[in-house]
Amino acid sequence: MSDLKKAAQQAINLMDLTTLNDDDTDQKVIDLCHKAKTPAGDTAAICIYPRFIPIARKTLNEIGGDDIKIATVTNFPHGNDDIAIAVLETRAAVAYGADEVDVVFPYRALMAGNETVGFELVKACKEACGDEAILKVIIESGVLADPALIRKASELSIDAGADFIKTSTGKVAVNATLEAAEIMMTVISEKNTKVGFKPAGGVKDAAAAAEFLGVAARLLGDDWATPATFRFGASSLLTNLLHTLELGDAPKGPQGY
């Protein structure tokens, strides 16, 4: 198997197959669940809005997808600095049955000089997850832009108990970049290598996935990236990867997240 095909295979098994659109419906989520069981094996998770968790759980159980985790989003997509609302949303997501919660860090507050609210919000949401769900923290690196802010948001999130740090919501102009990945995984290497990393949005094909996996291997070791420590947040990426593996047709039309 070529290096590109190896990267494609690995990326599928590390994928949070995502639909976070305003026009999502039960049927779109059912279809997503079926897509998550690919000819190259299951994706690690699906990522959906909280209201769709029950139908996703029912569908995955029916199709033998019990091992596919259900991730959802809170404080999404704007990363507001109201801790109480973020906690209520996170508790509700866990009550719905989420295995994983992707919460948006209050990145605009950090840009305005407030480091405390981000730490406290992540800490409170981690407590709200309890033992029921893992917490991924979206720092919106494309808006933070400044390497020092990307580093600070990563450090605060890890110090507050994040299980993963994630680049992006996929709802802004700049999503996952190799530059942000380098900073974020450097912080992981310095602080706690059990914390995972999730690039989201903008990873379009096997070659791009291989670049992100290459940064992980260089900074954290060849065997570090597993579903417990690395995820790709993506929707259109799956079609490209299956095409690379000669298990699906080439993608048609404009490619989303």
UniProtKB/Swiss-Prot annotation:
The annotated active site, in chain numbering, is D102, K166, K198
- Give the protein family: Belongs to the DeoC/FbaB aldolase family. DeoC type 2 subfamily.
Cell compartment(s), UniProt: Cytoplasm
Keyword Transmembrane helix assigned to the entry: answer is: no
Query: Which top EC class is given?
Result: lyase
Highest taxon listed in the record's lineage: Bacteria
Which GO BP terms apply?
2-deoxyribose 1-phosphate catabolic process; carbohydrate catabolic process; deoxyribonucleotide catabolic process
Establish whether keyword Oxidoreductase is in the entry: no
Q: What's its job? A: Catalyzes a reversible aldol reaction between acetaldehyde and D-glyceraldehyde 3-phosphate to generate 2-deoxy-D-ribose 5-phosphate.
E.C. designation(s):
4.1.2.4
Q: Write the gene name.
A: deoC
Taxonomy, top ranks, is:
Bacteria, Pseudomonadati, Pseudomonadota, Gammaproteobacteria, Alteromonadales
User: Which reaction is the catalytic activity of this chain?
Assistant: 2-deoxy-D-ribose 5-phosphate = D-glyceraldehyde 3-phosphate + acetaldehyde
Q: Which GO terms describe its molecular function?
A: deoxyribose-phosphate aldolase activity
Q: What is this protein called?
A: Deoxyribose-phosphate aldolase
Which pathway does the record list? Carbohydrate degradation; 2-deoxy-D-ribose 1-phosphate degradation; D-glyceraldehyde 3-phosphate and acetaldehyde from 2-deoxy-alpha-D-ribose 1-phosphate: step 2/2
